[in-house]
Design a protein with these regions (language model features):
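Mature extracytoplasmic/periplasmic domains
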Residues: 184-226
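Short, catalytically relevant binding-site loops at active-site mouths
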Residues: 96-97, 134, 145, 151-155, ...
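Extracytoplasmic ligand-binding site segments that recognize negatively charged/polar headgroups
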Residues: 1-2, 6-143
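Binding-cleft/active-site segments that stabilize strongly anionic ligands or cofactors
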Residues: 61, 179-181, 195
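Periplasmic-binding protein-like
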Residues: 39-43, 57, 117-121, 126-128, ...
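Short, well-ordered beta-to-alpha junction loops that form the rim of enzyme active sites
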Residues: 16-17, 94, 148-151, 218-219
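A ligand-binding cleft/hinge motif common to bilobed small-molecule-binding domains
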Residues: 18-22, 145-166
Length: 226
């Protein structure tokens, strides 16, 4: 945004959608080519078509079945602020991933409820540096459970499973903040000097081959019509 029309970049990619909105509000995007928009489900792109999602990550509750029976799983992300969850779950609060989850709580529950949830979280959870560290701690039985993105466990399972073999995933439902899906996005900058190539790249990364490559590396996907 600070570079504005002077940016030397052709394509803007970001991990979380709020950054896409900032650039879009500054009117720095060129419209995405119609052929690219057709590859992305309408739920994963704004109606005006200035940018598209290139990946989606689902918030999940990872737990160690040896320490936490399924009957005791939380019904909602908000439950984790309750006293019965003190010392029983972990998260990585410093990263953009968890900040996006908090933003979902704010959007769905409001400022007062979010503040109370954060106070309860502070009392109850254990902080880790990164989602991988949370997964490893749950797997090792150091803590009962944690809040991460799905692809950390999927990625480990696709390799050796060494850091996830003692874990399972629980998905929150019914418009719960814990059912939050974070979008990585991409758009062509209006200042690009190579717009044709930039549009071609965006079409590839949202297409079958680009999505297959992302799925193989990161277990991330976006919605494709049909």
């Amino acid at each position: 945004v600070q570079e504005g029309a002077s940016s030397p970049a052709d394509v803007f990619l970001t991990e979380n959608s709020p950054a896409m909105v900032l650039v879009d509000n500054a009117r720095l995007f060129a419209p995405v080519a119609p052929a690219t928009l057709e590859q992305v489900d309408a739920a994963y792109r704004p109606a005006h078509g200035n940018w598209v999602a290139i990946a989606a990550r689902s918030t999940v509750f990872v737990f160690n079945p040896g320490k936490l029976p399924e009957a005791d799983l939380p019904k909602t992300l908000m439950d984790l602020a309750g006293p019965n969850w003190k010392g029983r779950w972990g998260a990585s609060p410093a990263g953009a991933d968890f900040q996006a989850i908090v933003a979902a709580v704010l959007a769905l529950k409001g400022e007062a409820a979010t503040l109370e949830w954060l106070k309860g979280m502070k009392s109850n959870f254990t902080a880790y540096r990164g989602n991988s560290a949370v997964l490893k701690a749950v797997n090792a039985g150091q803590i009962d459970s944690g809040v991460i993105y799905h692809y950390y466990r999927f990625g480990d399972q696709a390799k050796t499973g060494e850091n996830s073999k003692n874990t399972a995933l629980h998905y929150f439902k019914h418009q719960d903040p814990g059912a939050f899906v974070s979008l990585s996005g991409g758009g062509v900058l209006a200042s690009s000097k190579h717009k044709d190539q930039a549009q071609a790249f965006l079409k590839w990364v949202t297409g079958k081959d680009g999505q297959a490559a992302r799925a193989q590396l990161l277990a991330e996907l976006i919605g494709r019509p049909g």
